[in-house]
Amino acid sequence: MNVLVIGAGGREHALAYKLNQSNLVKQVFVIPGNEAMTPIAEVHTEISEPDHQAILDFAKRQNVDWVVIGPEQPLIDGLADILRANGFKVFGPNKQAAQIEGSKLFAKKIMEKYNIPTADYKEVERKKDALTYIENCELPVVVKKDGLAAGKGVIIADTIEAARSAIEIMYGDEEEGTVVFETFLEGEEFSLMTFVNGDLAVPFDCIAQDHKRAFDHDEGPNTGGMGAYCPVPHISDDVLKLTNETIAQPIAKAMLNEGYQFFGVLYIGAILTKDGPKVIEFNARFGDPEAQVLLSRMESDLMQHIIDLDEGKRTEFKWKNESIVGVMLASKGYPDAYEKGHKVSGFDLNENYFVSGLKKQGDTFVTSGGRVILAIGKGDNVQDAQRDAYKKVSQIQSDHLFYRHDIANKALQLK
């Protein structure tokens, strides 16, 4: 069968790589993709991701059997709806169901209604009310802008001054807009991907841990993710089971009960508190860079899992008996302003590197985004995989990239 992947980043690179391995898949297309994907897929950078009509026309022309949507924006914009209306099979939720990521308030309200464990929250609609609220709120407080923010719309404020600054950032010159304040939760964070079809929820039996902050020791601003690893040895199978029972199954049932037909992967960003696992966020797609490490460890056929889910079967994932560590190299300045067009070399176009922000300029690759390339390390345990990942990092040549030196350290410190 012919499969079309939508997206241009490292997550989509990993999806294309994994789908290309499937005996069920004859051809993988990627729109818009990036040139690093050309060994495994037919890449069409000339078609832009927001051009839904061009994507539809391409899918018709190439007799595409399945479309796999990687990023959140096309889901929120209703690409899945348009494709389904024209008879295509799509892995990714429709516009209505994608609100679970598109609106933090939508997600909080549905969790509140169905008693799904999450932090207490307060919504405000005006800047002046936000400034009033923080005068007496408990610190630290988590400040979230409603809507999509590429993983960067969350600020943890430890002081009133930091909270005021967060509000200024969220509102800018506007006086109105929805901001959600949340009680700060303490504990170990983890990411659980769950395949969902209506009220059928099939969680991965392997979790990953992301590293959101830009710099070592979890310092600096939030990013889209500076690295990840799996499995997470200090999060037990019992916690995974509890997360499934108290979060994954209830949210699938809640969404269907509210009239939202979710089909795709639901990302559960959770935290293990002293009171058990609680939801930090939901995403309507694979995490990035979690997808890269999880799909590298997945032994079973991703395409078969998607078909099983479509047929309402409780698919069984199989995993390699190894650990995976992924370290992200990003443009200096990210997640704030950064330069583009800097040469990057030293890496191979294979499963050891997944590219997020590079483009071809002549025969060389140059930076084109904030997060640039993820180096994948493999090993019998986390320590060996971490060593292998940083060896792969050291092979990359560029004067304009930075990376964290402590990806997966938590797993080693908590042994």
Curated annotation (Swiss-Prot):
One Pfam entry name: GARS_N
Single biological process term from Gene Ontology: 'de novo' IMP biosynthetic process
Similarity-based family: Belongs to the GARS family.
The protein's Enzyme Commission number: 6.3.4.13
Pathway: Purine metabolism; IMP biosynthesis via de novo pathway; N(1)-(5-phospho-D-ribosyl)glycinamide from 5-phospho-alpha-D-ribose 1-diphosphate: step 2/2
SUPFAM superfamilies, alphabetized: Glutathione synthetase ATP-binding domain-like (SSF56059), PreATP-grasp domain (SSF52440), Rudiment single hybrid motif (SSF51246)
Cofactor: Mg(2+); Mn(2+)
Domain ATP-grasp residues, every copy: 108-311
Residues involved in Mg(2+) binding: E281, N283
PROSITE patterns: ATP_GRASP, GARS
Organism: Staphylococcus aureus (strain COL)
Top-level taxonomic group: Bacteria
Protein name: Phosphoribosylamine--glycine ligase
Catalysed reaction, written as an equation: 5-phospho-beta-D-ribosylamine + glycine + ATP = N(1)-(5-phospho-beta-D-ribosyl)glycinamide + ADP + phosphate + H(+)
UniProt xrefs under Gene3D superfamilies: 3.40.50.20, ATP-grasp fold, A domain, ATP-grasp fold, B domain, Phosphoribosylglycinamide synthetase, C-terminal domain
Key words of the record: ATP-binding, Ligase, Magnesium, Manganese, Metal-binding, Nucleotide-binding, Purine biosynthesis
Binding sites annotated in the UniProt record for ATP: 134-191
